[in-house]
């Protein structure tokens, strides 16, 4: 009962959205400031983000006339060896439960409802098994993988993806260290959050987001945590989140021979 009431203003704003800019504004009004900035920001002076926007603004879609097209139109194609209904797919995003309680599962269901392939981040807050359970059997799924120094961690995450029907792999090789995200530094962004006076004040200004955040299970990087549990059973020693995200993350990769192939 509480959540629908708190969400009512956000849903009204969302229903009134007619373009991507409107959706961004609606998200900014609903989400905690540090969470919105985490999603919206880039590194350093955010030059790349601005250039990306400028580059996309130069693209034009030229339609054909007198081409004999009539409803229903068919946009289906094949992406990474799988049939999809639309020619694009969701980008892997870390920490989706920060933005909404449904997190990766909610995004996966939305993608499936439009016949789009879904991609799950290594740093997702839902495990591959959770995502797979929320999707129709054999729905196209991609798993994004970071190259960790601990190869057993990588193997365990790949095993999770394979066992749960993820058919393709996106290998990230251009992230050898974390970007200098200045907005995150200014906001005091941490995972899990520090409940400072400033963060509490911002949370009170966003009751719908705050209710979502407090009513869901404890925030965790699910795939990484499950992989670490597997390694712990083998090594008989614990792995802290701090270690995973600093000492063991992102080695320098000078050469990788990567041939596209199916995980299944």
Where are these regions (language model features)?
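An N-cap/entry alpha-helix motif that binds or orients negatively charged groups
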Residues: 1-81, 192-261
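Phosphate/diphosphate-binding loops
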Residues: 157-168, 172-175
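Hydrophobic faces of well-ordered beta-strands that scaffold small-molecule active sites
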Residues: 88-91, 116-120, 141-145, 169
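Active-site-adjacent beta->alpha loops and helix N-cap segments on the catalytic face
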Residues: 99-104, 120-140, 148-156, 176-189, ...
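Glycine-rich phosphate/pyrophosphate-binding beta-alpha loops
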Residues: 92-98
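Conserved, mostly hydrophobic/aromatic
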Residues: 32, 90, 111, 171
